[in-house]
């Protein structure tokens, strides 16, 4: 086992704080509307340019082991905030640095770190309660757009795209972000349920312009096994032909004679049929067939529930207003399923999401919820270069998370104002059990000025002047760093999701408390470099002599 270096007390904390400062100083330049960029080297290709705090934090790894531990703990603040709220990573880092810096002074002055931590926790709990009180629900499209714009570093087009997407697919719908093909970002909405399986034969196409098979008011047959014998299908086909409506067959596989007969019937115009493979694999396939059944008001024909193809009646078939089957996708629009059944199914899948352990499973389950809830919106991010595309895509994803957070818990005044107002609301009401806890409370109440100070510094202003001016105002009165003016933050559209603000403060305080209560650090000792090999391998000088006498 390699030798370890153990450092105690003040020295340990000092080295850790150095690491915290290095990471936080690199991250905090990105804060606010006038935040600067950070350029990150890549091992190959062009460097990445970003204004996203968590992207900067993730790249930082320090040579000094003890400094690195401090930096990694603060990195945890950024990534945890990003995971929980999707935004607010820079704010969280700035707060963590401020709490550590202030707290370090108190600990150095001999205050008990454990009581200091308890004081910090008390202050944070009180502030979070005030933030929740001040929170204002986000309902209108305009408010959603404002939140999206702020989170995307004051880019209004992104905010508007997200608001439009939420209008189209609802607050619960799935919104995905993809690389666009043009310079402009655009929104693409797929209504109804889409799954990634297309027609089994191009002969089913009935709309050559779209290269798709369009079925109006069709029946839907869902079968969980292969269909290769046409005799199995005949009873169903006869009933559907009598009803004079088209049919979509979704099965594990339709092959051989069965597929050939369906194609011939379609070409001759006797019956309008399209066959597609069932989406997914294994258990997921069963679940998706069940989803389609609930959406269309039909049943999955499966032997395990006592249904066979010969016994199928029209009542067992699903129905929809319209179905489009392309080469690779099938879209079911306006299924005839009962709203109550669909809602119950969505609830059921939501419970599975809560219990899912892997990210992949969670993502697939969320896709199923979206498909049932009615629609998927795709934001296609446009940019001139690959580098800009990556940077912009990261911002859109951030903004999307922030908007979801705003819809969930509402918004508070942005620009660091909410913290100051929460502090004013608390006034001197919270008291610790002793002087050391009071110090912890005082420390947090001072540290929460940090985000506003940093926004002002990045905008080239004088932080103390602005903080005093904001404190002199009331309510949502704050500083708009984009154009150096003061006003009502909510009216100016400078909003932060309550969840983001709250999570940033809680995570920052949690990690800062850990740092302040550290008394010893253990890291691998630096290796003593072996002397350079200048004089190695003596006695090699005179080798290979005596070769001269060889005749060539």
From Swiss-Prot:
It is found in: Cytoplasm. GO terms for molecular function: ATP binding; ATP-dependent protein folding chaperone; isomerase activity; unfolded protein binding. GO terms for cellular component: cytoplasm. ATP binds at residues 30-33, 51, 87-91, 415, 480-482, 496. Pfam families: Cpn60_TCP1. It catalyses: ATP + H2O + a folded polypeptide = ADP + phosphate + an unfolded polypeptide. Its EC number is 5.6.1.7. Keywords: ATP-binding, Chaperone, Cytoplasm, Isomerase, Nucleotide-binding. Its main location: cytoplasm. GO terms for biological process: protein refolding. Together with its co-chaperonin GroES, plays an essential role in assisting protein folding. The GroEL-GroES system forms a nano-cage that allows encapsulation of the non-native substrate proteins and provides a physical environment optimized to promote and accelerate protein folding. Forms a cylinder of 14 subunits composed of two heptameric rings stacked back-to-back. Interacts with the co-chaperonin GroES. Belongs to the chaperonin (HSP60) family. PANTHER family: 60 KDA HEAT SHOCK PROTEIN, MITOCHONDRIAL. This is Chaperonin GroEL. It comes from Verminephrobacter eiseniae (strain EF01-2). The lineage of its organism: Bacteria, Pseudomonadati, Pseudomonadota, Betaproteobacteria, Burkholderiales. The gene is groEL.
């Amino acid at each position: 086992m390699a030798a370890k270096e153990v450092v105690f007390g003040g020295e340990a904390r000092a080295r850790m704080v150095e690491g915290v400062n290095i990471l936080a100083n690199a991250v905090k330049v990105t804060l606010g509307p006038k935040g600067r960029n950070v350029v990150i080297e890549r091992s190959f290709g062009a460097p990445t340019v970003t204004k996203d705090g968590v992207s900067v934090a993730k790249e930082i790894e320090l040579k000094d082991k003890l400094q690195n531990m401090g930096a990694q703990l603060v990195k945890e603040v950024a990534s945890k905030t990003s995971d929980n709220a999707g935004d607010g990573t820079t704010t969280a880092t700035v707060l963590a640095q401020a709490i550590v810096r202030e707290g370090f002074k108190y600990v150095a002055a001999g205050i008990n770190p454990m009581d200091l931590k308890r004081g910090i926790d008390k202050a944070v709990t009180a502030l979070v309660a005030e933030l929740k009180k001040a929170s204002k629900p986000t309902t209108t499209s305009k408010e959603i757009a404002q939140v999206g714009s702020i989170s995307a570093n004051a880019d209004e087009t992104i905010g508007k795209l997200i608001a439009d997407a939420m209008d189209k697919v609802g607050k619960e719908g799935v919104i995905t972000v993809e690389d666009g093909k043009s310079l402009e970002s655009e929104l693409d909405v797929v209504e109804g349920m889409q799954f990634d399986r297309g027609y089994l034969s191009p002969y089913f196409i009935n709309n050559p312009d779209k290269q798709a098979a369009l079925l109006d008011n069709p029946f839907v047959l869902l079968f969980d096994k292969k269909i290769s014998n046409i005799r199995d299908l005949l009873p169903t086909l006869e009933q559907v032909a009598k009803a004079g409506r088209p049919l979509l067959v979704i099965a594990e596989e339709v092959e051989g004679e069965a597929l050939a007969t369906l194609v011939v019937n379609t070409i001759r115009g006797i019956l309008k049929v399209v066959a597609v493979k069932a989406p997914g694999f294994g258990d997921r396939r069963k679940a998706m067939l069940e989803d389609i059944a609930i959406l269309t008001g039909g049943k999955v024909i499966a032997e395990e529930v006592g249904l066979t193809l010969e016994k199928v009646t029209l009542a067992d078939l699903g129905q929809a207003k319209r179905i489009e089957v392309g080469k690779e996708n099938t879209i079911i629009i306006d299924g005839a399923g009962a709203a109550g059944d669909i809602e119950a199914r969505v609830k059921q899948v939501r419970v599975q999401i809560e219990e899912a352990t892997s990210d992949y499973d969670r993502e697939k389950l969320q896709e199923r919820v979206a498909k049932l809830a009615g629609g998927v919106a795709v934001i296609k991010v446009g940019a001139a270069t690959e580098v800009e595309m990556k940077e912009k895509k990261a911002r859109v994803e951030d903004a999307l998370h922030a908007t979801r957070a705003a819809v969930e818990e509402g918004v508070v005044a942005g620009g660091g104002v909410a913290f100051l107002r929460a502090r004013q609301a608390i006034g001197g009401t919270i008291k610790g059990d002793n002087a050391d806890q009071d110090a912890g409370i005082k420390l947090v109440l001072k540290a929460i000025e940090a985000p506003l100070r940093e926004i002002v510094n990045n905008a080239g202003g004088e932080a103390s002047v602005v903080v005093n001016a904001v404190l002199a105002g009331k309510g949502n009165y704050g500083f708009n760093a984009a154009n150096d003016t003061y006003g009502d933050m909510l009216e100016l559209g400078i909003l932060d999701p309550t969840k983001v603000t709250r999570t940033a403060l809680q995570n920052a305080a949690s990690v800062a408390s850990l740092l302040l209560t550290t008394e010893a650090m253990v890291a691998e000792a630096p290796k003593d470099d072996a002397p350079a090999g200048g004089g190695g391998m003596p006695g090699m000088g005179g080798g290979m002599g005596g070769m001269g006498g060889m005749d060539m």
